[in-house]
Amino acid sequence: MEGAGAGSGFRKELVSRLLHLHFKDDKTKVSGDALQLMVELLKVFVVEAAVRGVRQAQAEDALRVDVDQLEKVLPQLLLDF
């Protein structure tokens, strides 16, 4: 992700490359609007994962978020998306 604050997020080039890595047909194209939507979806997903990880860490009286907390919130997060 880019720097913190407003305007931070994933670069379109990165998201486009990630999408194309998983397309079965090399000729598949992604429109600019679809790409922008994926960028926003990834941004929301990552922020939500971080927030849920913090809440889980607080519930466990942990001082920092660790992989363990993220692993605990990930199943429900995936179901919510």
Swiss-Prot record:
GO terms for biological process: cell division; chromosome segregation; interstrand cross-link repair; kinetochore assembly; positive regulation of protein ubiquitination; replication fork processing; resolution of meiotic recombination intermediates. CDD domains: HFD_CENP-X. It comes from the Eukaryota. The modification N-acetylmethionine is found at residue 1. Keywords: Acetylation, Cell cycle, Cell division, Centromere, Chromosome, DNA damage, DNA repair, DNA-binding, Kinetochore, Mitosis, Nucleus. The keyword Amino-acid biosynthesis does not apply. Coiled coil: none annotated. One of its GO terms (cellular component) is FANCM-MHF complex. It is found in: Nucleus; Chromosome, Centromere; Chromosome, Centromere, Kinetochore. One of its GO terms (molecular function) is DNA binding. InterPro entries: CENP-X. DNA-binding component of the Fanconi anemia (FA) core complex. Required for the normal activation of the FA pathway, leading to monoubiquitination of the FANCI-FANCD2 complex in response to DNA damage, cellular resistance to DNA cross-linking drugs, and prevention of chromosomal breakage. In complex with CENPS (MHF heterodimer), crucial cofactor for FANCM in both binding and ATP-dependent remodeling of DNA. Stabilizes FANCM. In complex with CENPS and FANCM (but not other FANC proteins), rapidly recruited to blocked forks and promotes gene conversion at blocked replication forks. Heterodimer with CENPX, sometimes called MHF; this interaction stabilizes both partners. MHF heterodimers can assemble to form tetrameric structures. MHF also coassemble with CENPT-CENPW heterodimers at centromeres to form the tetrameric CENP-T-W-S-X complex. Forms a discrete complex with FANCM and CENPX, called FANCM-MHF; this interaction, probably mediated by direct binding between CENPS and FANCM, leads to synergistic activation of double-stranded DNA binding and strongly stimulates FANCM-mediated DNA remodeling. Belongs to the CENP-X/MHF2 family. This is Centromere protein X.
